[in-house]
A protein has these predicted regions:
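A structural micro-motif at secondary-structure boundaries
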Residues: 131-132, 136-158
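Active-site beta3 strand of CheY-like receiver
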Residues: 46-57
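C-terminal output helix
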Residues: 86-88, 106-115
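Short amphipathic alpha-helix used as the core "switch/output" element in two-component signaling
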Residues: 63-75
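Conserved acidic segment of CheY-like receiver
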Residues: 2-14, 19-23, 51
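Short hydrophobic/Thr-rich beta-strand motif most characteristic of the beta2 strand and flanking loop
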Residues: 26-36, 42
Length: 158
């Protein structure tokens, strides 16, 4: 599981730095952010293996944008890490598209376990065809399908 790319969003800079360093020590590549601004662009450019979100980030709720993220990246594992322990908030997180909810404070080893578990599950469910914007990538046949349905074939594996 090492070298997996994660986007981690936490508005508490100190906590975020501590968790980021711990995850780096476990071998993960982390894009740590303290704001939801630019998240969609980062998802598109980085294509992370997993996303970790705090529910409330600088007076913004990630639950408002989570359905759009889930719609655009249906296979992306998403963990919500929050101090909210209210059952309704937890259920709303799952309804919005989260794969797992971890309550703060948490032990980093618990977070790492959940990350590894979700990454293993997502590897088993990889689709043969990925949709990236208006393009499609067929990983089984090594094809890039353009919006006008032109096909670029690859003779080597990426």
């Amino acid at each position: 599981m090492t070298n997996s790319k994660l986007i981690y969003i936490e508005d508490d800079q100190i906590l975020g730095n501590l968790i980021t360093q711990a995850l780096v020590d476990y071998g993960f590549e982390i894009d740590f952010r303290t704001t939801l601004n630019g998240l969609q662009e980062s998802l598109a450019s980085m294509l992370p293996d997993l996303l970790i979100l705090d529910i409330e980030v600088n007076n913004q709720s990630c639950l408002d944008i989570l359905p759009a993220i889930r719609s655009q990246y249906p296979q992306l594992p998403i963990i919500i890490a929050s101090s909210h322990t209210n059952g309704a908030k937890i259920v709303r997180s799952y309804d919005a598209g989260a794969n797992h909810y971890i309550k703060k404070p948490y032990d980093v080893t618990e977070l790492v376990f959940q990350i590894q578990n979700l990454l293993q599950q997502s590897e088993k469910q990889l689709p043969a065809i990925w949709k990236i914007g208006t393009y499609q990538v067929d990983t089984a046949k090594h094809l890039l399908i353009y919006p006008d349905e032109r096909i670029l074939s690859s003779t080597y594996k990426c």
